Amino acid sequence: MRIDYIDFFSRVIPEWMARSNQKSQEVGFGSDTYWLWVVTTIGEICKQYNDDSLVTEQFGLLFNWLEKQAG
């Protein structure tokens, strides 16, 4: 599978971040519902990209950043 990294970084990541912000406002950033959504959606997107290492590492960075924000 050839991956369009430009599309991934310019569309997929920003769209996911926007949905993440919306979800955190809906259910609360610290809620189990939010974190389940985070893990589920990250997993789904990574699978769409056949768990490509750059994709999974990027989402790993985002997940770690979110955890730090949560305190």
Task: Name these PLM-found stretches.
Residues M1-F29:
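N-terminal acidic leader/helix
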Residues C46-K68:
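Short, charged early-sequence alpha-helical segments and their helix-coil boundaries
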